[in-house]
Curated annotation (Swiss-Prot):
Chain ranges on the Virion surface side, renumbered to this chain: 1-561
Disulfide bond in keyword set: yes
Source organism of the structure: Varicella-zoster virus (strain Dumas)
Name this polypeptide is given: Envelope glycoprotein C
One Pfam family this sequence matches: Marek_A
GO cellular component, one term: membrane
Outcome reported for the amino acid change (mutating V26G): In strain: Scott
UniProt KW keywords: Disulfide bond, Glycoprotein, Host-virus interaction, Inhibition of host complement factors by virus, Membrane, Transmembrane, Transmembrane helix, Viral attachment to host adhesion receptor, Viral attachment to host cell, Viral immunoevasion, Virion, Virus entry into host cell
C-alpha cells in the first residue's frame, strides 16, 4: 500500500459541510467508497435546496381565479430561490419535474442500475476500471453519462421550458407546490349583533367591501375610497379606473321592520316579530330603487344610503331612530346572474324612550269613591309598561282598576291606569294611602322601576246659609277647609269686590275644618235685589256650594210706614179711651 496525499476539497450545501484533508494510506476501494458517499450527500443537498417555494400572487391576479388565470408572457418566470433563469433552461423543481428517459436518474434512491453494471450496493460494488478514480470536485463528467447536478445539467430539447410560477400541474403527477389563493369579496361592518339606540337619535352603520383570500384568510382593503387603478385589459399603456367589486356581483341592503307581539313575552323581554323585508339599496341596474318611487321615497326620507356608483363604502345612516326604522339591516354581496349570495352581514337596531311618570290622587267628598291616577307618558317600545296598585291593605284587585293606552303620531305611547275604591265607614278617616308601582322594560337586559304613594283628599259637605241681620246680608259656611276656601259675593248676577270673612268656630263633625261667616251691606234702591254667596277654593270637580237671598228695599219701607200708622192710631185710640174712662170715673165720684 502506497501513501497518497489527497488535495483538500469541500462539499457545501444547505444542510452540511464536509471537509476531507490530509495524507492517509487508503486503498483504491476505500477511496471509491468515500467518493460515492460524498456524491450521494451532494445530490441530496441539491434536491433540498431546489425545492419549490410558495408562489407569490400579484395584485393584478386577485380578480382572476386560480383555475382560469394564465401566466403573463411579459413576466420572466422566477424560482423560489430567486435565481435568474436561463431562457434555454427550464427552472423546474426536483420534486415536481418528470425524468428524461435519456437522462440517468440522479438520486441514489431512485436511479435504475445500468444493465451493464452488476447491481451491487454502494458499499460493496467495485469501481469500473475504465473510470479514473478522481474526486467529485475535480473529475470531468462522462459524455455518456447525464449530468447529475441541477445547476449544471442541460435541458432536454424535447422538454418545454416552464417556470414554477406559470407551469400547469399534471393531474397524473404528485404536485407538492402550493396553489394560488382563491379570492372572494366580503362585506364587513363595524357594528354587529343588536344595537340599542335612543329614540330620535341618528345612527351610522359603517360597512365596507373587502377582499378575502381563502388560503391566507386575510383581509385586503382598498386604500382608495371607491375605485383602484389597474391596467387596461386590452394591454395598452393607458390606465383607467376599475371597480373594486367584480362586474358579476352587486350589493343589496335589506331592511326588516320588527313588530312587537303584545301576547308573547319571554320573562321581561319583549318578543319582536319580523315584518316583510324591504330593499333599501342596490347598485344593480336591474334593481335600481329609483325606478320604485315608494321605496325610494322611504329610503330618502329616513336614511342616507350609498351612491349607486360606489364600490367600497356601503355605509347606511339612520337619520332619526323611531318605530319605522327599528329592525334588522342586511348587507348582501349577490351574484347578479345566479342570484346566489356570496356573503352577508346583518345588524339589528332597537330603540327606546324613557317615560315620564306622575301619580295624582283625586279629591273626593265624604261618602264618595276614592280615586287615583298613574300616568306613564311618552315611552317606547310599546307594551313595555307594567302597572300594579297597592294600599296598606295589600294589592288592589283588578276589578277596581281601569287602564287605557294612547299612541301618538311620532310612534310614542302613553299609559294611564286609574284605581277607584268605594269608601267604607272604617276607611273614612284617615283616607287610605294608595301606591302605584311601575315597571318599564327597555329591553331584555335593562329596565326601570318607579313607585309613588298618593293620599286622596276627602272633604265634608259644607253647610251654607244666608240671611239679613241688622241691615246686612250675612252668609255662614260650616265645615270648610281652613285657609283654602273664601267667600265670593254676587249681586244680581254680577260679582262685587267685597271681602269680609271671619272664622267663627270649628266643625262639629271634623275638627280639621272650621266655620266661617261673611256679610254684605244691603242696597237702598227700590225693587228686588238678589244676593248670592259662593264658596271658592274647592276642587273644580266638586259641585258649587252657594246660598241666595232676595231683598227689596221699597217693600221694606212701605211695610214700616203701615206699621207706624197702625201703631199711631192704636196709641191715639188708647189715649182717648183712657181719657173717657177717667172722665166717667170723675163724674160718678162727683155725683
Amino acid at each position: 500500500m502506497s501513501k497518497k496525499t489527497f488535495p483538500s476539497f469541500k462539499f457545501r450545501g444547505g444542510c452540511f459541510n464536509l471537509l476531507f484533508k490530509g495524507s492517509v494510506d487508503v486503498s483504491i476501494k476505500t477511496r471509491m467508497k468515500r467518493i460515492q458517499i460524498n456524491l450521494i450527500l451532494t445530490i441530496a443537498c441539491i434536491q433540498l435546496s431546489t425545492e419549490s417555494q410558495p408562489t407569490p400572487v400579484s395584485i393584478t391576479e386577485l380578480y382572476t381565479s386560480a383555475a382560469t388565470r394564465k401566466p403573463d408572457p411579459a413576466v420572466a418566470p422566477t424560482s423560489a430561490a430567486s435565481r435568474k433563469p436561463d431562457p434555454a433552461v427550464a427552472p423546474t423543481s426536483a420534486a415536481s419535474r418528470k425524468p428524461d428517459p435519456a437522462v440517468a436518474p440522479t438520486s441514489a434512491a431512485s436511479r435504475k442500475p445500468d444493465p451493464a453494471v452488476a447491481p451491487t450496493s454502494a458499499a460493496t460494488r467495485k469501481p469500473d476500471p475504465a473510470v479514473a478514480p478522481t474526486s467529485a470536485a475535480s473529475r470531468k463528467p462522462d459524455p455518456a453519462v447525464a449530468p447529475t447536478s441541477a445547476a449544471t445539467r442541460k435541458p432536454d430539447p424535447a422538454v418545454a421550458p416552464t417556470s414554477a410560477a406559470s407551469r400547469k400541474p399534471d393531474p397524473a403527477a404528485n404536485t407538492q407546490h402550493s396553489q394560488p389563493p382563491f379570492l372572494y369579496e366580503n362585506i364587513q361592518c363595524v357594528h354587529g349583533g343588536i344595537q340599542s339606540i335612543p329614540y330620535f337619535h341618528t345612527f351610522i352603520m359603517p360597512c365596507y367591501m373587502r377582499l378575502t383570500t381563502g388560503q391566507q384568510a386575510a383581509f385586503k382593503q382598498q386604500q382608495k375610497t371607491y375605485e383602484q387603478y389597474s391596467l387596461d385589459p386590452e394591454g395598452s399603456n393607458i390606465t383607467r379606473w376599475k371597480s373594486l367589486i367584480r362586474p358579476d356581483l352587486h350589493i343589496e341592503v335589506w331592511f326588516t321592520r320588527h313588530l312587537i307581539d303584545p301576547h308573547r313575552q319571554l320573562g321581561n323581554a319583549l318578543i319582536r316579530m319580523p315584518d316583510l323585508p324591504v330593499m333599501l339599496y342596490s347598485n344593480s341596474a336591474d334593481l335600481n330603487l329609483i325606478n320604485n318611487p315608494e321605496i325610494f321615497t322611504h329610503a330618502k326620507e329616513n336614511y342616507v344610503i350609498p351612491d349607486v356608483k360606489t364600490t367600497s363604502d356601503f355605509s347606511v345612516t339612520i337619520l332619526s331612530m323611531d318605530a319605522t326604522t327599528e329592525g334588522t339591516y342586511i348587507w348582501r354581496v349577490v351574484n347578479t346572474k345566479t342570484k346566489n349570495v356570496i356573503s352577508e352581514h346583518s345588524i339589528t337596531v332597537t330603540t327606546y324612550y324613557r317615560p315620564n311618570i306622575t301619580v295624582v290622587g283625586d279629591p273626593v267628598l265624604t261618602g264618595q269613591t276614592y280615586a287615583a291616577y298613574c300616568n306613564v307618558s311618552k315611552y317606547y317600545p310599546p307594551h313595555s309598561v307594567r302597572v300594579r296598585w297597592t294600599s296598606r291593605f295589600g294589592n288592589i284587585g283588578k276589578n277596581f282598576i281601569t287602564d287605557a293606552i294612547q299612541e301618538y303620531a311620532n310612534g310614542l305611547f302613553s299609559y294611564v291606569s286609574a284605581v277607584r275604591i268605594p269608601q267604607q265607614k272604617q276607611m273614612d278617616y284617615p283616607p287610605p294611602a294608595i301606591q302605584c308601582n311601575v315597571l318599564w322594560i327597555r329591553d331584555g337586559v335593562s329596565n326601570m322601576k318607579y313607585s309613588a304613594v298618593v293620599t286622596p283628599d276627602v272633604y265634608p259637605f259644607p253647610n251654607v246659609s244666608i240671611g239679613i241681620i241688622d241691615g246686612h246680608i250675612v252668609c255662614t259656611a260650616k265645615c270648610v277647609p281652613r285657609g283654602v276656601v273664601h267667600f265670593v259675593w254676587w249681586v244680581n248676577d254680577s260679582p262685587i269686590n267685597h271681602e269680609n270673612s271671619e272664622i267663627t268656630g270649628v266643625c262639629d263633625q271634623n275638627k280639621r275644618f272650621v266655620n266661617m261667616q261673611s256679610s254684605c251691606p244691603t242696597s237702598e234702591l227700590d225693587g228686588p235685589i238678589t244676593y248670592s254667596c259662593h264658596l271658592d277654593g274647592y276642587p273644580k270637580k266638586f259641585p258649587p256650594f252657594s246660598a241666595v237671598y232676595t231683598y227689596d228695599a221699597s217693600t221694606y219701607a212701605t211695610t214700616f210706614s203701615v206699621v207706624a200708622v197702625i201703631i199711631g192710631v192704636i196709641s191715639i185710640l188708647g189715649t182717648l179711651g183712657l181719657i173717657a174712662v177717667i172722665a166717667t170715673l170723675c163724674i160718678r165720684c162727683c155725683s
